[in-house]
Curated annotation (Swiss-Prot):
The gene is JIP5. This is WD repeat-containing protein JIP5. Keywords: Nucleus, Repeat, WD repeat. InterPro entries: WD40/YVTN_repeat-like_dom_sf, WD40_repeat_dom_sf. It comes from the Eukaryota. Its main location: nucleus. GO terms for biological process: positive regulation of transcription by RNA polymerase I; ribosomal large subunit biogenesis; rRNA processing. It comes from Scheffersomyces stipitis (strain ATCC 58785 / CBS 6054 / NBRC 10063 / NRRL Y-11545) (Yeast).
Length: 533
């Protein structure tokens, strides 16, 4: 048993990326939605309580602090290794006992010298805040945010101040009074704001005139169940969108209705995106879809008009792919062909869809949380500088764009050692919308209580005036959590014999093959539901 535990740790160290977060924010109430400003270091978070918070962060300072702290800890660990105090130098990010990135223990109490500032906060919705997005129009990109809650109200607010500038009660347009909004999507070329519902309908409003506008378009029964995702297709038409719901993918024209609907996939379709190279080339032909059974499928309009999947990529057999997003990084072909996936086991996977496999794994959460197992990754965003942002209901992490050079070199050496025997073997994956109404006009006829609740509170802590050198050390978690093994991606199988490694200058333990690493891993999976939220 002791040997098996040691092998599991070795597996985690080999499979886990050395890239670490630069910032971690923990939430005292469940986090339901997240939005990253497309051009500035600004985050919007919506909670189950209906509160919306706006945080601004100094990314460069956080990167510098994280790098310096990591280097310091690495030197300390090397010294301890030389003195025999530790048996090995750990490369694992998730299993580190001394996290080197900045940690905010409570989103409501941000330390002054943390590199993060809360710009404003407000009680935006009476129920929970279900979705939040930034305005993507080129003429006003990021100037406004749209949020929707279980109170059935879509609100448009200034992203700088949080002040409401427009809103609409969508319940008046529900065919069934029991319906509710699940997802929002804004066109990148016009003022159409789409809202998907739990009963599978898509409602379209004019975002420039929310206060006085009526329903502009409606697509009834786009799906038999809740709309899980809406994706604009600007390269095809300003009125064409893809929607996911239950077990089908639909291609819709918001003016005319459903164009095509896929075959039943016998598996819930949860998330989708276009790859970076497709977006960069102005194409909307290939879409990647995350499934409830832990796979990512590839669909092409040019092949079968999105009627069925063409290829599937295995990601995590025992988890659902709850979120997927393109890297938005065109610096090299590898990143351009990759998408990030977040699963229900708290893991992050970078999938190269052209290679048809997982090429990088990170760990958002590896410990038991307040709501059950590991903090499930249900939210993914890319910040203004292509940093990955992952979030579950308990925490949010902004990941570094830089890889530790020394650790990266060590991993490269390990990879070279195993290249002869494991070059082609990898079972983790398989190849195959009138002017905006004024604030007074909108708010005057409402109850005074609503006005008080929805008034944003501005917090004066200008981040720009803070010196990078004044940042203090890294905060640490106080609560102890039970650690569980990470990267448990495949089921147990028969173990292979270990291959002998060539002698090097320094004694080195026998390297485990990829298949042996997989064989050491177990699975635990459960999908938790928050009813009526």
């Amino acid at each position: 048993m002791k040997k098996r535990k040691s092998n599991a740790v070795n597996a985690a160290q080999v499979l886990e990326s050395s890239v670490s977060p630069i910032l971690e924010i923990n939430y005292s109430d469940p986090l339901f939605t997240l939005a990253a400003h497309p051009t500035e270091p600004v985050l919007i978070s919506g909670l189950v309580t209906g509160h919306v918070f706006c945080h601004r962060y100094d990314a460069e300072a956080l990167e510098e602090k994280q790098s310096a702290r990591r280097e310091q800890l690495l030197l300390q660990e090397k010294e301890a290794f030389k003195k025999g105090k530790v048996s090995q130098i750990s490369k694992s990010v998730s299993q580190s006992k001394n996290p080197w990135w900045t940690i905010i223990k409570d989103h409501t109490e941000v330390p002054q010298e943390s590199g993060v500032v809360a710009s404003w906060k407000t009680k935006r919705h009476k129920g929970s805040c279900r979705h939040a997005i930034f305005e993507p129009l080129e003429s006003s990109v990021g100037e406004n945010i749209f949020t929707v809650g279980t109170d059935h109200i879509i609100k448009k607010a200034s992203s700088e101040t949080g002040k409401v500038v427009g809103k609409v009660d969508v319940s008046l347009d529900f065919p069934n009074s029991n319906d509710s909004i699940t997802k929002l999507c804004h066109s990148a070329t016009n003022s159409c704001l789409l809202a998907g519902t739990e009963n599978g309908h898509v409602l379209v409003y004019d975002s420039k005139n929310l206060g006085g506008s009526k329903l502009k378009y409606k697509v009834s029964s786009a799906h038999d169940d809740a709309v899980n995702h809406i994706l604009a297709m600007p390269a095809v038409s300003a009125y064409h969108y893809l929607t996911l719901g239950s077990t089908t993918l639909s291609h819709i024209d918001i003016r005319k209705g459903i164009i095509t609907q896929s075959d039943n996939q016998d598996d819930e379709l949860l998330s989708m995106c276009f790859a970076t190279d497709q977006i960069n080339d102005g194409k909307n032909d290939t879409v990647l879809v995350g499934h409830g059974e832990g796979i990512v499928t590839i669909w092409k309009n040019s092949k079968n008009r999105f009627m069925d999947q063409l290829t599937r990529i295995k990601v995590n057999k025992e988890a659902s792919i709850d979120a997927i997003i393109p890297t938005m990084n065109c610096d090299d072909d590898e990143m351009a062909a990759s998408v990030w996936c977040g699963d229900s086991e708290g893991l992050l996977h970078r999938v190269n869809y052209k290679k048809g496999k997982v090429v990088e794994t990170r760990v958002h959460s590896s410990s038991r949380g307040k709501y059950g197992a590991a903090d499930e990754v249900g939210l993914l965003e890319i910040d203004y500088d292509y940093r990955l942002i992952s979030a579950g209901m308990e925490s949010l992490k902004i990941w570094s764009n830089e890889q530790n050079e020394e650790i990266a070199l060590d991993e490269s050496d390990d990879s070279d050692d195993e290249s002869d025997s494991d070059n082609s073997e990898d079972d983790l994956s398989s190849g195959s919308l009138s002017d905006t109404a004024s604030d007074e006009e909108i708010e005057e006829n409402k109850e005074e209580e609503d006005e008080k609740e929805d008034k944003p509170v501005k917090i004066d802590h200008p981040l720009a005036n803070r010196s990078k050198k004044g940042l203090v050390g890294v905060s640490k978690h106080v609560t102890k959590k039970k650690q569980i093994d990470i990267n448990k991606l495949t089921k147990k199988g028969k173990e292979e014999e270990e291959e002998e490694q060539p002698q090097k200058k320094k004694p080195k333990k026998d390297q485990l093959s990829t298949k042996q690493l997989r064989n050491m891993q177990k699975h635990e999976h459960g999908i938790r539901r928050f009813d009526d939220l």
